[in-house]
Amino acid sequence: AKLGMYKEDLINKSFHSLTPKLLLRYAPGQMRNIESVSKRLSYANLFSLNKVDELDVVEPGLSTSIGFEYKKNKLNDSNDVGEEVFSLSLGQVVSEKENMDIPSSTSIDQRFSDIVGTSKYNINEKLNLNYNFSIDQSYKNFNYNEVGTDLKFEKAKFNLSYLQEKNHIGNKEYLQTGAEFKLNNSSELGFNTKRNLLTSSAEFYNLSYSYINDCLKAGIAYRREFYTDRDIE
């Protein structure tokens, strides 16, 4: 269930919407143990009936997903809703009881899950920011952080992303960058790289060239991957 609330600000030419959401769910029976499977709860699957995304598994028992979605849009000259400027969505799963058969990485094995959310800020037509996060039920620690930004020009695009997983979700931290350059109407040059911040080492470099016309698309790519082995010094 969801209930939308709206407000128009004609002076500042903006439109605000707030939508509380609720999913009440009950499934009888038992489930097989999948505690060792790597899964993660996010706002994208918060209101899904099958949050663990296993075809033969349904989480048993009574649970409630609660959250909200807030959006701010521009109003155009005719006061119709236009481009989105900012959005924030977050929520949590509350279960009747714990279930240790569910992967701890999802946090829905506990009665109160992590608070998960996503946010986007379109600064202008060229630059935007995205943020996905997970906060523990005590509101003290961020267990998951994913920040990304895209910068677009007429003949060039740049992107930067940062990801961190901690505690029950995982143990990762890396930075990934990419760029695309339009050389002319039919050719592009691309580059991206990923760096592991826990080991202070590069994981890969990609360099690509693409040729595109009305009936043909061809490309050349060079990829170099790196690895570490504790037995090799």
PLM features: residue spans?
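Outer-membrane beta-barrel translocator/pore domains, especially the C-terminal barrels
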Residues: 1-210, 214-233
